[in-house]
Curated annotation (Swiss-Prot):
It comes from Clostridium kluyveri (strain ATCC 8527 / DSM 555 / NBRC 12016 / NCIMB 10680 / K1). The keyword Kinase does not apply. GO terms for biological process: DNA replication; DNA synthesis involved in DNA repair; double-strand break repair; SOS response. The RecF protein is involved in DNA metabolism; it is required for DNA replication and normal SOS inducibility. RecF binds preferentially to single-stranded, linear DNA. It also seems to bind ATP. This is DNA replication and repair protein RecF. Keywords: ATP-binding, Cytoplasm, DNA damage, DNA repair, DNA replication, DNA-binding, Nucleotide-binding, SOS response. InterPro entries: DNA-binding_RecF, DNA-binding_RecF_CS, P-loop_NTPase, RecF/RecN/SMC_N, RecF_2. Belongs to the RecF family. It is found in: Cytoplasm. Pfam families: SMC_N. Gene3D superfamilies: P-loop containing nucleotide triphosphate hydrolases, RecF/RecN/SMC, N-terminal domain. PROSITE patterns: RECF_1, RECF_2.
Length: 364
């Protein structure tokens, strides 16, 4: 899979951009705040219909304009695809795939698969469970429509349940709460089961990758942390947990248990890297997660996704840089950097270089 062509109109600092890419390595060089990351952001947006940097689509629209436009041509093993997205200031978006309008975001998922690696990804390791749940949700939605549907339905029911909990003192809603709990347990089972399976696969792929990066010194493992004691009867057990904690939920006015509160831990040699790992170990863990994600997607769809490396080489030591640059020969890769000193000459010789300056891109 690779992106052949990208067109932007009024996207971030680009008034208009038409650009063709090499199917292997593409490097964007330029000072900070010139628009390098914006190009990668537009590709990511075409993958899942959301930005990795903001939850407000209107921020993607160039100043004083009412809409922006993204178009990508994707070449895959079995077919070619063209994605067009219009983003409107009032918060709506229009998506066409091969000139056919699609009404559901789920129809966009999987058309263009990307894995993005940026310095911000350290938050997955270092900060709250929100970032780790978001990582799981995004990765699973890329290839599992079952997960996407289950997640959407679960969140709808969760929102409705929390509304009932907040206004409990104004009436007795026990019957409707019973219905909501059954629905949460049903959709929660889908989420928990697929998350647990994904983390097992991430551990399997990650062990090999992490061992390569650390010369066999470190062993990595990803472990799902949930309110359940086992995964044998997820739906029944989750319903019982919701039922048992109902009074507590009513008192707090919020649902305290379920996959929306789950987490996962990253262990290196049996030690939680979030609490006790060095900065280097935390960075290596993220690198492992990203490259394990690449391998999982390849295993499922039969080809590598597109890899987006946003200003990460300068953040890594020589060994980690070496691992990345030796692992991308079969993967279309987009690299942003302020200079090419951190990139091997052999890579540069094979890559397509672009200079980015004030929203203008020129091919070298």
């Amino acid at each position: 899979m690779y992106i052949k062509y990208l067109k932007l109109i009024n996207f971030r600092n680009y008034k208009e951009l038409d650009i063709e890419f090499d199917k292997n390595i593409n490097i964007f060089v330029g000072d900070n705040a010139q628009g390098k990351t914006n190009i990668l952001e537009s590709m990511y947006y075409c993958s899942i219909g959301k930005s990795p940097r903001t939850s407000k689509d209107k921020e993607l629209i160039n100043w004083d304009n009412k809409e922006s436009y993204i178009k990508v041509h994707i070449l895959k093993k079995l077919f070619n695809k063209k994605i067009e997205i219009k983003i409107f200031k009032e918060g709506k978006k229009g998506i066409n795939i091969n000139s056919i309008k699609v009404s559901k975001l789920s129809e966009l998922m999987g058309v263009l698969n990307v894995v993005m690696f940026s310095p911000e990804d350290l938050k997955i390791i270092k900060e709250s469970p929100v970032y780790r749940r978001k990582f799981l949700d995004i990765e699973l939605c890329k290839f599992s429509k079952k997960y996407y549907y289950g997640l959407v339905q679960y969140n709808k029911v969760l929102t409705a349940r929390n509304i009932i909990l907040k206004k409990w003192n104004k009436g007795n809603y026990i019957d409707i709460l019973q219905v909501y709990d059954k629905q949460l347990a049903k959709y929660g089972e889908v989420i928990i089961k697929l998350r647990n399976n994904y983390l097992k696969k991430l551990s399997e792929k990650g062990k090999v990758i992490h061992s390569d990066i650390t010369s066999g010194i470190e062993n990595i493992e990803f472990k799902y942390m949930t309110c359940l004691t086992n995964f044998d009867n997820i739906e029944d057990d989750l319903f019982k947990i919701l039922e048992f904690n109902r009074k507590k939920d009513i008192y707090k006015g919020i649902t305290l248990y379920g996959p929306h509160r789950d987490d996962f831990i990253v262990n290196i040699n049996g030690v939680n890297v979030r609490n006790f790992g060095s900065q280097g170990q935390q960075r290596t863990s993220i690198l492992t997660m990203k490259f394990a994600s690449l391998e999982i997607i390849k295993e499922i769809i039969g080809e590598y996704p597109v890899l987006l490396l946003d200003d990460v080489l300068s953040e890594l030591d020589k060994n980690r840089q070496k691992y990345i640059l030796s692992s991308i020969k079969d993967i279309q890769t987009f690299i942003t950097c302020t200079g090419i000193d951190d990139i091997k000459k052999s890579i540069i010789d094979e890559a397509q270089l672009f200079i980015v300056k004030k929203g203008k891109v020129s091919r070298i």
